Amino acid sequence: MKKILQRMDKPILLISIIMFAFGLIMVLSASSMESYMRYGFSPYHYFIRQAIFLGVGIIPFIFIIVFPTSKYKHLINLAMFGIVGLLIGLTVWGSVAKNAQSWFSIGPFNVQPSELAKIIIIMFLAMYYDKHKDELDNQWVLLKPILLCIVIFVLVAIQPDLGTAAIIALLTIFIFYAVPMTKKTRNIYNKIFLGGILVILSVLLATGGSFLRSYQAERLNFRDPCERYQEESGYQLCNSFIAFKNGGISGQGIGESTQKYLYLPESYTDFIFPIIVEECGLIVGIVILVIYMILLFRIIKIARTATNIHNSLIAYGVFAYIFLHLLINLGGVMGLMPLTGVPLPYLSYGGSYTISLMVAIALVERVAIETNTKKEKVLRKS
């Protein structure tokens, strides 16, 4: 275990420990009032649950960093078809929350298979393209795994959970483009994806989004939220802006947020960043963004130095996974794009996402361990 710790990427490990700890503190602060009013006058309900999620996440984290990725490659296909089965099962046995049938209720906890699907897609595509690395000039070989990802996308979209579905689609596309292929082949797919985007935009413009449910169409309108205060999306975003304004440069102090007093819905999940800025100030908000940038830089570095396609695609996939959550969450709470209910890495409350993120970080660390192990062997031989 000592050698494993020595070969891990220390900045990523340190960032993860600090951010998860800070996130736990902010979940306590942001959720205390709702917890107090809903769960027997105790402010610690969500805090305790989040601590449990982190504790559970340590188990797969340790497993992944200890065992080489080659040890469980053969299980990925089974996991991929298993997650498809779970998503199909949601249509019959799933619990409805926040207008989406996305969860299985297991005792006091809810499990969201679509969060696990993101990680499994990363591992599946990495395993597949590494296995077929000598056949990547064959179009069918390139596209075959994408078809299964499309099935997962559709199953998530019909829940309906368009935010998670969008991340699954973009994550798949990003990993696909990270696959080494000829320039000619890449140009062909550039045209296909551009054409697909134009078709989607044309459908949206032609229909005016009439195929969307009312609350989904409302979320697409993210302009002038305070003038739409009676609408759900306007109410949420306007209170998000108020939280940012209240925080100023230095913040009101941890625990001193006013927006968490049931003014800002989802203050400890999707909208935790405005609460952080309100309590800790713009300076801390900027520091958090810088930490995220350092994290992403380290992951890209690991992806570029990986010793094989499998490990490289895993690292690129985790980069995209974290980046997309950052982009969509922060873009939404800042009014730069529609609200989609996507959690903020490390900081938002949520069991399925927290455990999935810990698995993702463990995968990157395992790639770093294997790269550093190989470097050490080369140095010893020389």
Language-model regions, residue ranges each:
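Hydrophobic alpha-helical transmembrane segments of multi-pass inner membrane proteins, especially
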Residues: I17, A21, Y39-S233, P274, ...
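Alpha-helical transmembrane segments of multi-pass membrane proteins
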Residues: I17-S32
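N-terminal membrane topogenic signal
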Residues: M1-S16, F47
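A juxtamembrane structural motif centered on a specific transmembrane helix
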Residues: M1-K2, V27, N329-S382
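TM-adjacent membrane-interface loops and short helices in multi-pass inner/ER membrane proteins
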Residues: F222-F273, C280-V284
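Helix-boundary and loop/linker segments of multi-pass membrane transporters
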Residues: I4-Q6, V141-L142, Y261-L264, A306-T307
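Juxtamembrane/transmembrane-helix boundary motifs at the membrane-water interface
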Residues: S32-R38
